[in-house]
Amino acid sequence: MEIERLTTIERIHQAAKIEFMEKGFRSASLRNIVKSVGMTTGAFYGYYKSKEALFAALVGEHYDYFIEMFKTAQEDFANLPHERQPEAMEGISGQCMFQMLHYAYEHLDVFQMILCCAEGTRFCGLVDEMVEIELESTHAYLNVLAELGRPSPKIDPHLEPVSYTHLDVYKRQY
């Protein structure tokens, strides 16, 4: 049986993932990461310029893909003929949700780091960014409904973000 040898980058990533998952980005110690890999902090800087750059190497590609997947679904829906949007909403929304959940579960550790361990990085606002995208799309859709002669009641702007983060959960329960 052949023993698998990890490259230095792989060992850094493995140690960083453990440290970030245990302590979160802010409390994670770069010294602990490099020490567990058996290298110096100076040697680490030959690979990454900062602890945040290391965190970005672990989660950045997945974060960007996830947000892009969500934006694409919103854009695809908005590009449908207006008269088709009401009937197509549930299908497009459900398909997008399934794809996003599937992707997140395929990369569960990464999304745990993004959702629970990213405070102090540009990645800590995933849910907020998605809510903003959803708000913008919803406002555009409300205009489409009004154009089709199906106006909806005015939504209190202070309650919109709360309702969007909870509405889908409620809808799927019942």
Language model regions located:
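Short, hydrophobic secondary-structure boundary micro-motifs
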Residues: Q112-I114
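Hydrophobic alpha-helical connector segments
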Residues: A57, K71-Y103
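N-terminal intrinsically disordered/low-complexity leader segments
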Residues: M1-R5
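Amphipathic alpha-helical packing segments from all-alpha helical-bundle domains
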Residues: G91, Q95-E106, E119-L148, H158-P161
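Helix-turn-helix
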Residues: R11, A15, E19-A53, A57-L58
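Conserved small/polar residues in nucleotide/adenosyl-binding loops
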Residues: T165-Y174
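Short, basic, alpha-helical segments at the C-terminal edge of helix-turn-helix-like DNA-binding modules
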Residues: G60-Y65
